[in-house]
Amino acid sequence: GVYIYNENKELIPGSVSSVGNIQSIEVVKRGCGGVVKLLRLKGSEAECVISGENTIRTVLGSSGAVINTLTGDAHYDILPSAFIVIKPVYAGDDNVISAFKIYGGGFGHGIGMSQNAVRKMSETMSYEEILKFFYKGVEIKNVAA
């Protein structure tokens, strides 16, 4: 759900539209496989948290943003996945945030290894680094020896 901080700093049910102009977006918690489970938005009027993978996908995808995939598809009502990274876009020399760009990979549940993420990660990471990213605490051994 979406929750707003009230004047007593308590979280109450609310809507993203009440935060005003969004000044920052912070990933607070990630779940299994790296999907975002909790976001914090700070705005000119209020601060809110968005909880739950599907709520995050719906809120960010329904914001009027154009969602483009690597194949050029742009027909999504929600983000295809909560496996995302959010970066601010700055305008001008005074470093004012003009927008946020969302980078993502994969579709659906976010459990296991995302093929789209691995494709991009393989440009700069070894297979060992990629496996250890998706499967925490694993040890890679040669079992044939």
Q: Which ranges hold each PLM region?
A:
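Conserved, single-site charged/polar hotspot
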Residues: G1-A145
